[in-house]
Amino acid sequence: MKVIKGGIVYQGDGWRYNADILLENGKILDIVPSGSYEGEQVVNVDGCYVCPGFIDIHIHGCAGRDVMDGSVESLEEMAKFVAGHGTTSFLATTTTSSLEATRNSLKAVNEIMKKQSQGAQIIGVHLEGPFINSRAKGAQAEKYILPASRDNFAELVGEYEGIVRRITMAPDIEGAQELTEYLVNNGIVVSMGHTAASYEKCIEGIEWGMSHATHFYNAMTPLKHREP
């Protein structure tokens, strides 16, 4: 048994002070007053806060590395860096780029997911684009924006569809409904973003299965008194 000893532990209903966390085979068995148990492995945290790790669902890069490098080495360095800041898993997030660059990035993520052992775990890919509205492209490259369609999605991800966990898409572009329904039916979270959609169109998107918003208030139209 492993014991994380003497921590300030956050649970859903509040904080427990001077507490020990008992672990077996990577799972929490119990949280008890400090000193109640000894383990084969003891990690003394001496009054530090102990919380569940963060899951980052939108990260393009860090530590001088970028998901679009298309490099396993870059992803490994990212994973080590974010682990030091409390993130235990993340979705490697692409930008709206060329087919070749996107495929190279997906290939690298696929490779690291098979063998990764250090740092935060990469649990899949978040595709930010290319199915977005050019009016709200933000930092995305307009020349690589594509109409939403199952064919374009299939061409973009190729054999790596299985690692795509999340995609940012504008509900107000051609083909958005059909592609959204396909993605949701295949277990991929569809998030509204980079959109000039009206309130009514956003409600339609929710009805199709869109369930999140990407960097809310950024890359979208401003609120107006007659167009909320």
What do these predicted regions represent?
Residues 71-74, 105-108, 149-151, 226-228:
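Charged helix-capping and loop-helix junction motifs
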Residues 133-158:
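Conserved phosphate-binding/catalytic loop of the ribokinase/pfkB sugar-kinase fold
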Residues 7, 21, 26, 47, ...:
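Divalent metal-coordination and catalytic microenvironments
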Residues 158-228:
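Active-site core of metal-dependent hydrolases
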Residues 61-73, 139-146, 189-193:
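Active-site mouth loops of central-metabolism enzymes
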Residues 1-37:
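N-terminal metal-binding scaffold of metallo-dependent hydrolase/deaminase domains
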Residues 60, 76-105, 120-133, 160-172, ...:
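Divalent metal-dependent hydrolysis catalytic cores, especially in the metallo-beta-lactamase
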